[in-house]
């Protein structure tokens, strides 16, 4: 029977002496994972900007002047080319994000074909497209989508300070639709939005007490973008962030805890402490949607220093003729692409 975390239990974890907390987190990590391996994902923005939502941290919102270049939905050849590059670089999962409040029905055939083609390349797939209804979730699942990302971002009580165009309950409904469809859930939050410690406690409680815990939990450090309302937020204290990773590992022992956005601002020592605290997944590549990320070369050097081995490193490379066959076999017609690409 799954443990249900109480407020008092979660508070006690946050109050633990730092090294005691780290020891407990590392123990939990070793019970469920090889401590010397790390899961690598690559994230691509397949449709950038012009989002109608008002998330105060996001440069893709049409409400803020951030200088972001808007881009329509990428053509399937561009997406598959990026997926091949990610696979050849060692990524086992290809994640795709579109700046929508939610996908429209005209988008679904295009999205389904993208999923099928990337699955043929031998990669896990993940998408983040906004809110989903149960019918859309089922279509994506039937196409072969492995994971769907929909973050809770912060606590229910603090949420309306960050976003007003989508309710917290809508986010929970989407997670329910994803879980009911048979897909795996990817859901986490952002640290540094101006939240209090209590909000961090409540966020981790909400995630850990879902009917089934998320298989993947991205923990993001706010990337402060000029032009957004959160551009001047205070920096997150590194040890506070490491503590959150450790508590997340203890509360969700079988989940992959992903060290996500903001990693490019962390030095090697902070990242190493996060891995020690139980983080065992990263995004690999120079961009996370529109935010910077450490260069691949630097990540490989860090892995070497820490003796970390990427998961599924033994996966076979995609041969050029196999890749060309996948491209040619795409059933997407130009009118389907143009219908989906309308902003």
UniProtKB/Swiss-Prot annotation:
Reaction(s) catalysed (UniProt annotation): (4R,5S)-dethiobiotin + (sulfur carrier)-SH + 2 reduced [2Fe-2S]-[ferredoxin] + 2 S-adenosyl-L-methionine = (sulfur carrier)-H + biotin + 2 5'-deoxyadenosine + 2 L-methionine + 2 oxidized [2Fe-2S]-[ferredoxin]
Sequence positions that bind [4Fe-4S] cluster: 51, 55, 58
InterPro entries (alphabetical): Aldolase_TIM (IPR013785), BATS_dom (IPR010722), Biotin_synth/BioAB (IPR002684), Biotin_synthase (IPR024177), Elp3/MiaA/NifB-like_rSAM (IPR006638), rSAM (IPR007197)
Keyword vocabulary terms for this entry: 2Fe-2S, 4Fe-4S, Biotin biosynthesis, Iron, Iron-sulfur, Metal-binding, S-adenosyl-L-methionine, Transferase
Keyword GTP-binding found: no
Top-level taxon: Bacteria
GO molecular function, one term: iron ion binding
Pathway the protein takes part in: Cofactor biosynthesis; biotin biosynthesis; biotin from 7,8-diaminononanoate: step 2/2
GO biological process, one term: biotin biosynthetic process
The EC number(s) this enzyme carries: 2.8.1.6
Protein function: Catalyzes the conversion of dethiobiotin (DTB) to biotin by the insertion of a sulfur atom into dethiobiotin via a radical-based mechanism.
Quaternary state and interactors: Homodimer.
Protein name as catalogued: Biotin synthase
């Amino acid at each position: 029977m799954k443990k249900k975390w109480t407020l008092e239990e979660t508070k006690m974890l946050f109050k633990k002496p730092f090294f005691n907390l780290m020891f407990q987190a590392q123990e939990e990590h070793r019970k469920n994972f090889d401590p010397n391996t790390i899961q690598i994902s690559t994230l691509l923005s397949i449709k950038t900007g012009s989002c109608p939502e008002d998330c105060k941290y996001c440069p893709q919102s049409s409400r803020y002047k951030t200088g972001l270049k808007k881009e329509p939905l990428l053509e399937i050849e561009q997406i598959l080319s990026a997926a091949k590059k990610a696979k050849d670089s060692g990524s086992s999962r290809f994640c795709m994000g579109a700046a929508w409040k939610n996908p429209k029905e005209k988008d679904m055939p295009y999205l389904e074909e993208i999923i099928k083609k990337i699955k043929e390349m031998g990669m896990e797939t993940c998408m983040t497209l906004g809110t989903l209804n149960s019918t859309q979730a089922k279509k994506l699942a039937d196409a072969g989508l492995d994971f769907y990302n929909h973050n809770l971002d912060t606590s229910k009580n603090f949420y309306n300070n960050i976003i007003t165009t989508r309710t917290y309950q809508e986010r929970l409904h989407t997670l329910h639709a994803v879980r009911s469809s048979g897909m795996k859930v990817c859901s986490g939050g952002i640290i540094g939005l101006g939240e209090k410690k209590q909000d961090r406690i409540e966020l981790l409680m909400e995630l850990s007490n879902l009917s089934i815990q998320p298989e993947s939990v991205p923990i993001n450090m706010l990337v402060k973008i000029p032009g957004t309302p959160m551009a001047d937020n205070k920096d997150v204290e590194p040890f506070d962030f490491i503590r959150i990773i450790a508590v997340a590992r203890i509360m969700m022992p079988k989940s992959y805890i992903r060290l996500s956005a903001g990693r490019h601002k962390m030095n090697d020592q902070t990242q190493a402490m996060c891995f020690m605290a139980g983080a065992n997944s990263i995004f690999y590549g120079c961009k996370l949607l529109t935010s910077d990320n450490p260069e691949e070369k630097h990540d490989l050097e860090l892995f070497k220093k820490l003796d970390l081995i990427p998961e599924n490193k033994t996966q076979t490379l995609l041969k050029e003729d196999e890749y060309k066959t996948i491209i040619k076999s795409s059933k997407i017609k130009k009118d389907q692409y143009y219908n989906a690409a309308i902003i």
